[in-house]
Every structure is written in structure tokens, then in C-alpha cells.
Amino acid sequence: MKEEKNITPMLAQYHKIKDQYPDALVLYRLGDFYEMFYEDAHTGARELNIVLTKKKVGKDRYIPMCGIPFHSADSYITRLVSKGYKVAICEQLEDASKAKGIVKRDVIRVLTPGTYFENEKLKSALLGIYQERGRFYIAYLDLSTGEFTGGSLNRDELISFIGKFQPKEIVVQEGYDFSDLRSQFKSIFFSQLPEDYFSEDTHSEFLGFFKTGHISAFGFDTEEQNVIYPLSAVWKYAKVTQKSFLPFISTPKPYREDSYVRLDYSAQKHLEIVSPNEGNIPLLRVMDRTLTGMGRRKLRFFLLHPLKNSKEIIKRQNAVTELVENTELREKIRDILDQIFDIERLISKISSNTSTPRDLVGLRESLKKVSKLKEISKEIKSDLLKESFERIEDYSWLIEKLDRYLEDDPPIHLKEGGLIKKGVDKDLDELKEIKEKGNEWLKSYQEKLRKETGIQSLKIGFNKVMGYYIEVTKPNLKLVPDHFRRRQTLSNAERFITDELQSFEEKILSADEKIKALEYEIFMRIREEVAFLSDRIGKTAQQVGMIDAIQSLAQIAVEKGWTKPDIHDGYEIEIKEGYHPVIKEFMPDFVPNNLKMNRNSYFHIITGPNMAGKSTFIRQSAIIILLAQTGSYIPAKKGKIGVVDAIFTRIGSGDALAKGLSTFMVEMLEMANIVNNATERSFIVLDEVGRGTSTYDGLSIGWAISEYLAEKVKVKTLFATHYHELTQLEREIKGVKNFHMDIFEDGENIKFLYRVKEGFSNKSYGVHVAKLAGIKEQIIKRAYEILYYFEEQRDKKLEEDIYSLKQKENSYLNEINELPLFKEIEDIEKDEYRQILEEIESIDIGSITPVEALVFLNDLKKKIKRLKES
């Protein structure tokens, strides 16, 4: 900040502090307000919609200023942090009345989007990224729960991870170009950290904090060792920003994508698992029957991390089944869970010194309910639930202590008193007795004064500004004795003090201050003891979350009448009368559909008009498979699910269009990801491919991709398309089957039946849909005329082109084979031919995609044609 001349000591102090936090809004404590100055004031006033005023700092000199009340600062801070600002809290470090000169102040904490954890409605989580040799080493830290994890990811896995965990802030090493991530995740706040955050000294501090000597102690493999860079950087960032308020952080755990079904960012968005598209509702909201914060987070994790080990799926499924079938047990568990607070968040607040007395009481009451959960563990039969119940620790000793120490209904603020019960501390009890006897003395003294003065309405009161006083109404003022000293005049009364009352006030207020100080001291000791148990209590909270998530899956299954799918390691998938669980909520008459995929029928081409239900059917199929592999029951009459290793989707392109990518480029990038990563065990959903280019280009690419996926990969695929020509693939490739959306026709009118039927649709019904939408009759009539003409031409020419495609391919190859290029290599003298040969030799057959192969072959053909002509 620019130096100013002739400024007050207070402003000089402010400048010194602001210079240390140039990228933060500094909230500078002045009495009962936090003040902002200069540019911070302009920003604060604008973002908080509060008055921008000015402060006089010299003769005819003013600076911009705005302020927020100390007692309601949290709501203002939340608004600033949620908008992506860093906020530095600068507190008074001494009593202003006792300070010599300027009051000591310093920043006690820096709040950022990724580290502000007190507000339960504002999700905060921090992601650190360290890049080396094409790998992304990551560390994820949620200070609100203490969750800490790290891993080694490729770029696609990184994007998927960000989509799943949705951090509010990403920290990277200085100089790292994160512009591509910023453009994709506009709501995330990015921070660059200096090199020392990634240094060996920081590594040593980090390992020392967790009392270990090497990263392998956390379970990281040799090839994951670089994860220490983001882990230690994120830990230091939290430590530097939170200072003495650093909450409990659990021991880092390895995060490995290969433990779960691959669910990339596109699939997360297209299936709307936790984040809906505009105007829609996510799957999570429909599925959620959890009763605790821990359970809600665990259920979210389940949906974003489906299992791919059949034994693990069945183990979780059996736990769900036990609660589905045992209504009494399920309701007993739900009744207990409904009374448990978010223990993980409470532990974070308690360990960070930001908790209130009520937080500790909330923890006490929650642990009582957890003990009740423990009591019913003998009724549990399924392995997974039994493990969770058995891992719940016995905290009866801690509950007893908190019961004995803490009042049942303490105040919100620490220093108001009323925190500690009688019998805890002898000195405290004596002081409380003085105060209680004081109350008796006041009643007695008030009665005495009434008798002496004859003023029956005389009363003794107290307020924080004036202290104790004797109040007499104006009609009785003539009866006031001389030894009453006037303290205050009101509109209808006068207030007085006497020597006796003043002496009592000094004595009782002294006792009250001592009570508050001693209670605060005792409370802080208790809080420290509980904070020491954070790790153990946190592990119990995780088990409560697991139990809650499982009962939630059971509850939704019972409510909706879902069925238990048969999970197996085979290839087949069969779903009978399945439906979309979200759409069904708003369409009770939703039409269910069947899906059967096996070695003879695994690539389904689905045709039919828009609005007929193609997109809904392919999405619901993916969602049902996903739910089955979370261990959930499914929205279907029956299900037989061969475990998949990945769910891929190619639907829509809105987000990427905003980044300046064409529709076609978006499609090709997504298809490249699918083609490069899909295996025979995957499941693919394609909703149109090749829309963003010419009809023939789009059809050719759709055809080539379908051939590759069906012939080479043999991956289970649902391909919804308007390219009716693709239905001819059923004749060419075993496993390709045609399906269409059933339509009822009545003359020129149609009715969508929303049923998937075998065979292909030879009509698009696009004009019918336009008619339903209300397009003018004359346009509809003209559209039919044009449609009939195009269909006639297509029948003559397009089918001929498609059938001759393979012959043309062979013709191209024959042309190439006849060239000197493919005769004796030693006879080739032309540099152009040699260059072409080198290009061919350089191709990696194992990694080239079908689309890349087509482009390469086309370029090669053009080059050879030019050479022949020359």
C-alpha cells in the first residue's frame, strides 16, 4: 500500500497490517465494528450493499470507510467469502481500556473460499495440485470435516475428481498455468503459492505434524511419492491462514480412481448425479433419505463412486437388504439418527477454538444417541453393518464428564457465564453462592426501602450501562429520602443509588466477573480434552455416516418399491420395466422399458423422433446400472447387472460451447476420450454423434465409430441417433441390434408411446414434432413437400453410397498398392514417396483412434493423388 504522510498511529498500524495481506480484504476491529478502508471499503460496500462513508484523518483529509457490526459479522463474512474474496480478520489483542497508546492488533485468521468452514450452508474444501511429467498429484482437504486425501491422476481423472468433490478453492505452485481449469470451472477460486510451500522444509514440517518420517506411512505407493508436494502445501496453506484456529485434520489417505467405476466429468454432468442442469433436479436429491450430515456426504460419495468389485457391491447390497426386510430395525435406527448432529463439523469447530458452548452440548447429546446405536449392534446380521456398529467406540465416560460439567442450556457466547454446573469447582461454587445470596439480599433490601419510604412501587433494577439502581415514579418523588443520590432522569421516573447499594454492586459485580473468568477457564480445559479426542470421535462419526447412507438406500427402496438387482461378473445386463427415478417423481404415469444386452445383442442403435423418449431411456439405463453398483436397489421390476468398469456418456455440448469450442469439436473430444478408454466391460451412452458437421461427414464418423466400438471393443452401447442409415450396421456386425421408439399414427397425427421396440424406425417424424410445437400450417405443408422429395432422393442415392462404402475403401487401398511406393523400397528415389513411407511407418496402430485413422488415410490419398498428377 502506498505510504501516506502525517497519518494517525491507528492508520499507520492499519497500513502495516494491510501490507502483509495485500490480496485480502482486511476487517480491522474498532470497538464494536470491523472497519474496511481505502479500496477494501469500496469493495466491501459494493459487495455487501452497505453505506460507503469516510473517515477524517487530518485537516480536510478523508479516506473511504465502511463497517460491519462485530456481533453480526459472520453473515457478512460468509457473503464475501462465497463471492471468492479472501478476508483477513484483524482483532484487538488487548483491552482498549487498559492499553497504553494504540491498542495492539493483528490478523488472527485469513478466511478463503476453501478454508472458511464454520458456515454449514457454505461448502468449503481445498484442492492442491502439483504437476510433473504429465501427472497431476493432488491433495484434497475439507476443514469442516477433517477429510484429507491425496493421489496421482492423469488429466481426465483430475477433471473427474474436481467434478466429484467440487472444491471451492484450488491452490497451485507459482507459475503454473491453470487457465484451462479456470475456464472449465469458473466458480472455483484459484490461488498460486510461493515455492517454499512445496519445499523440503515444508515436507519435514508436514511429516512431523503427523508424527511420521515418510509419506509411505500413509499408504502411498512408490509411484505416488510426489503426492507429498500438494499434501504439504495444502496443509501449510491451512496452517498459515487459520493460525491458532487450525481444526482437526485426519491422517491423509490415498485416493485411487481405479477402485471405483470410471465416471468422468461428462457422465457426472449428463446423468445429473449431484449437480443438475438448469431447471432440473439431481439424482442425489431424489435418493436422499439420510438424517445426518455425515450420512449425506457418504451417500453423495456412494453415487459418485460406484463399486466395480462384485463382492463389495453384494456386501453393501446385503446390508441394504437387511434394513429393507427388517422394518422395526430400520425405523429404530432412523429414530436415533434423527437426533444426531453433524459430529464431524462439531469436532472441527471444537478443535479449531471456534466452537460455542452449545456445540459442546450438541456433541454430548449426539454421543448419547450414538451410544444408543451401539446398544442395538447385537441385532445386526449383515457383515458391513455389523462392522460399522462394532467400530463405534464407547464414549460413556466422556458423556458422563460433559454431563457433570456443562449446563444443559448454556448461552451462545463463551464469556457470558452460565456454562458450568455446581459441584465442578469449589471456588466457582463459593462465588456463585455469593451471587445467589446477593439476589436474596436485593429482595430484602428492596422490601426494607419500601417500608422506610412508604413507596410501594419502588423497585431495584440493573443494566449493563448504569449498574444497580433504585427506581421511583414521579408521583412518589416527594417521599424520596435525602440519602438517595440521583443517577438518571426518565420521562416518568427517577433512578437513584445509595451507599449500601453501591457497596453491594462492587461486591457482586466482582464475583460475577470472577465467575465468568473461572467458567471460561474450566470450559477451555474441557474443550481441549475433547479436541484431543478428535481423531477417535471422527472415526466414529464416519461409521455413523456409513450406517445412515445404508439406511437411506433401504428407505428409498421401501418407499418406492424398488427391487434388488442380481449382481454378477458376467457380460449380460437385463433390466425389466426400468424407469428414470427423477422423472418418475414428476410423472407418475411414466412408461417403463426393458433392456437386454448380451454377446449377441450389445450395441443398440435406437431411432425415433425427438420427444419420443430416446434420451430418457438411455440415461435411465445408465443410472440404473450406476445405482446397482452402489449397492442400491433399482427402479425396475427386475434387474440382472453384469458389473461394468466405466460409464461413458456423449450428450449435449452447452458448457464447452461457452468456452468457444464448436459443437463438432466438443463431440469429437468426448468421443476420443470414450474410444481411447472404453473396454469390453464398460457401458456407453451416446445421444447423437456427428451433429455439428455436414450430414455425410456426421454419418461417416458415426458409422466408423460404431464399427470400432461394436467390432473391436465389443462394448455395451446405447446409441440414440437420427441417422437411420446406421441401422444397416445390424446386417454387417454381430451384436448390433436396432431398436426404435414406438409411435401410434392416426393419419397425419401421431402419439408418442414411449416404448422401446425392436427394429428400426424408417421415419423421423420431425415435421410432426414441429406441428405439435405450433409451427404455422403453411410451413408444415411446405415441409412435407420438401421431406417427400428428400426421402425419394435418399432412397435412390444414399443407400447406394453406404453399400458401396467398403468397395470404395478397397478401391482406395488398391490405388495405393499400385504405386511405386509399395514396390521394392530400394528403387524409390523420390523424396516425396520416402516422406509418405516414413509417415506410415511412424503410425502407432495400437493408439490411433478410428477418427484419426480416417483423417490420416484421407490426407494420404490426397498426397498420392497430387504425386500421380505431377
Swiss-Prot record:
CDD domains according to UniProt: ABC_MutS1 (cd03284)
GO cellular component, one term: cytosol
TM region positions: none
HAMAP family: MutS
Family: Belongs to the DNA mismatch repair MutS family.
Keywords attached to this entry: ATP-binding, DNA damage, DNA repair, DNA-binding, Nucleotide-binding
Record's protein name: DNA mismatch repair protein MutS
InterPro entries according to UniProt: DNA_mismatch_repair_MutS, DNA_mismatch_repair_MutS-lik_N, DNA_mismatch_repair_MutS/MSH, DNA_mismatch_repair_MutS_C, DNA_mismatch_repair_MutS_clamp, DNA_mismatch_repair_MutS_core, DNA_mismatch_repair_MutS_N, DNA_mismatch_repair_MutS_sf
GO annotation, biological process: mismatch repair
Binding site for ATP: G608, P609, N610, M611, A612, G613, K614, S615
Highest taxon of source: Bacteria
Role summary: This protein is involved in the repair of mismatches in DNA. It is possible that it carries out the mismatch recognition step. This protein has a weak ATPase activity.
The organism of origin for this protein: Persephonella marina (strain DSM 14350 / EX-H1)
